[in-house]
Swiss-Prot record:
Signal peptide: none annotated. HAMAP family: UPF0145 (MF_00338). Pfam families: YbjQ_1. It comes from the Bacteria. This is UPF0145 protein Bmul_3577/BMULJ_04940. InterPro entries: UPF0145_dom_sf, UPF0145_YbjQ-like. Belongs to the UPF0145 family.
Length: 122
């Protein structure tokens, strides 16, 4: 199965920005907040392995990998939500995370879902 070709106007990761405007485009309509929320827990094995890494200092690769995967999953869910709202871009994108229990972390990715049009002359 092949993916259908995307419209040049379709929402893709390159149309997501932390800025309040998408460069080279004018915001035509704000559609509301798009968000993706992921709740992850650490396994007993992962927690033990990470505890061993803390003895030696430096980057705790097990937690780094878990955080990267959680952020990417939250980002993907935010894109899905923005598409559902009819957006072709997301501006003012942010991440936040909170530990909601022992070893349980919530990661949220959110931004303003918008419809944009290329600036005149583009």
């Amino acid at each position: 199965m092949t993916d259908a070709p995307r419209s040049p106007d379709a929402l893709s990761p390159d149309r997501v920005t932390t800025a309040f405007d998408l460069p080279g485009h004018t915001t035509v309509r704000a559609l509301g907040v798009a968000q993706g929320i992921v709740v992850r827990s650490r396994s007993i094995v992962g927690t033990f392995g990470a505890s061993l890494q803390t003895l030696f200092g430096g980057n705790i690769t097990l937690y780094t990998s878990l955080c990267e995967k959680a952020r990417q999953h939250a980002f993907d869910k935010m894109l899905d939500d923005a598409r559902r709202l009819g957006a072709n871009a997301v501006v003012a994108m942010r991440y936040d995370s909170t530990e909601i229990g022992s070893g349980v972390t919530e990661v949220i990715c959110y931004g303003t879902a918008v419809q944009v049009a290329p600036d005149a002359g583009r």
